[in-house]
Amino acid sequence: MKIALGCDHGAYLLKNKVADHLRKAGYKVVDFGTNGPESCDYPDFAAAAARAVASGECEKGIVLCTTGIGVSITANKVKGIRCALLSDVLSAKMTRLHNDTNMMALGAGIVGENLALEIVDTWVSTPFSGEPRHQRRIDKVMALEKE
């Protein structure tokens, strides 16, 4: 599986740890930056990662900033993206099982490294349940993009 990563200056250190962790687990990582502490605009990097997922270049995506809020809002503006802001393992599991999210967001100032990696592991390894009730709900959400 190929996973897109994107972050701003507030989360580049955690993004690098997530990238290394995913590579060690056998995933391919496409890093859309940023890669340093210089101030930058999170929409540039979150949108690049989201576009890679929406286009099929990457199967999933993870975006990060200090709180995760800005990058999750940005990713969700890209057609076809369902991005969940996560700060606990149960939500990581449920958003895959019930919502079939294709992106997740983390706040580097909210979750520590160990919890972040546990959330990532849970999210990437949990399949969508495929239950008709959940698919029906996803279809209704995705139909909103046509309004």
What are these regions (language model features)?
Residues A4, G10-A11, V89-E147:
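C-terminal binding/interaction regions
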Residues K28-S39:
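A short beta-strand-loop structural module common to alpha/beta enzyme folds
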Residues F45-L85:
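Helix-adjacent hinge/juxtasegments
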Residues M1-K2, R23, A49, L144-E147:
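SAM-dependent methyltransferases
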Residues K15, Y42, A46, S72, ...:
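A general structural signal for well-ordered alpha-helical segments in protein cores
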Residues A4-K24:
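Glycine-rich phosphate/diphosphate-binding loop of Rossmann-like nucleotide-binding domains
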